[in-house]
From Swiss-Prot:
Residues spanning the membrane: none
Pathway annotation: Cell wall biogenesis; peptidoglycan biosynthesis
Record Gene3D superfamilies: Mur ligase, C-terminal domain, Mur-like, catalytic domain, NAD(P)-binding Rossmann-like Domain
Entry's localization field: Cytoplasm
InterPro entries named among the record's database cross-references: Mur-like_cat_sf, Mur_ligase_C, Mur_ligase_C_dom_sf, Mur_ligase_cen, MurD
Protein name: UDP-N-acetylmuramoylalanine--D-glutamate ligase
Enzyme Commission number(s) of this protein: 6.3.2.9
Pfam families to which the protein is assigned, alphabetical: Mur_ligase_C, Mur_ligase_M, MurD-like_N
A GO MF term: UDP-N-acetylmuramoylalanine-D-glutamate ligase activity
Keyword Transferase recorded: no
Source organism per UniProt: Photorhabdus laumondii subsp. laumondii (strain DSM 15139 / CIP 105565 / TT01)
Role of this protein: Cell wall formation. Catalyzes the addition of glutamate to the nucleotide precursor UDP-N-acetylmuramoyl-L-alanine (UMA).
Amino acid sequence: MADYLGKKVVIIGLGLTGLSCVDFFMARGVIPRVMDTRTAPPGKDKLPDGVECHSGSLNADWLMDADLIVVSPGIALATAVLQAAANAGIEIVGDIELFCREATAPIVAITGSNGKSTVTSLVGEMAKAANWQVGVGGNIGLPALELLKKSCQLYVLELSSFQLETTYSLNATAAAVLNVTEDHMDRYPQGVSQYRAAKLRIYHQAKRCIVNAQDPLTLPEMGMDSRCVSFGVDCGDYQLDSENAFLKVHNQSLLATNEIKLTGRHNYANGLVALALADAVGIPREASLATLTVYPGLDHRFQLARLNKGVRWINDSKATNVGSTMAALDGLNLEGTLYLLLGGDGKSADFSPLKPFLCGNKVQLYCFGRDGKQLAQLRPEIATLTETMEQAIRDIAPRLVAGDMVLLSPACASLDQFRNFEQRGHEFTRLAEELG
């Protein structure tokens, strides 16, 4: 455990995670300074007396005077003043690094462009089914430092590429990179290779590495070694059989896919990697398999919002990048027409990989938001451009017949028109109930 007494600590970024960092240092006899680029940062009113707070910008004087900077994942390390601090030898970490220095129980760590929240919560539920005391958090649910406040036999962390950039002591018992597809290119000017390098940091000092056999970008930099176990829908140590009817481990059939509560090939892949992670930390196999038969998935992840008159309305608002939308469309079989809602802030992504999924005459595109016009160019002859998602849905509703599906899987972030992807999903569900 690290000793911070006497150190000048600056925390960048408030909110729940920033406050958890403040609590962490106060409990160790250190009064940190806090700054946030927002003029009215959330949680400012909850700061303890004596904690100085600078808001509206980064305070370069404070940063250059610090011994330790704890940076929010939302602030790029490439920011000039942070580069200057790093060049001056000032230590820069994130809350996950603080957590890892203190944690004594094994850690399961999960990253990837898509599916990480589902896999993280699924492994957590598998541990609970075995009556383990488990802490689940990180990029989902509770800030990691909050998990230190209760006794745990296991920690399960969802980690973003941004969080991994400032983490050095993870030493996970089991670590997985689910997939790597283009995302956050606004933060990674060198492209996918820079983004991938951040993701692969999760494998550093891991005892077991879970690798996607169908995505070479998830391979550790040094290649496969004895620490590695693979998963994949079509190949791997953990895979589906040729008929997609069973989950198999080392060619032994374990569970029929029709017994799994989650649906879709991408969710079967999530089940496989969760099982591999659970096996790696010794969760009894029967508890893991039982969990797969009852786990319903998370809100806004390919979630059935409404089924009426033979029409399915699917809320996949969490599909905030191209890879996630590709996963939703992969293997989708419909009797009728797919009405696909795309749009929002594309984060400088290349949308062209979606094209192969938009073939045929049984799909209609409805594109909205900041990058709607660019998305409509994927297949202009079947695309309708609207300003908002609501306008698109009101146009779609009268056209629907039994067998059709309305799928919100936008391939974009929501912040151009919504508070977050959850609000976008709730709005879709409200409109589905009103018009469907």
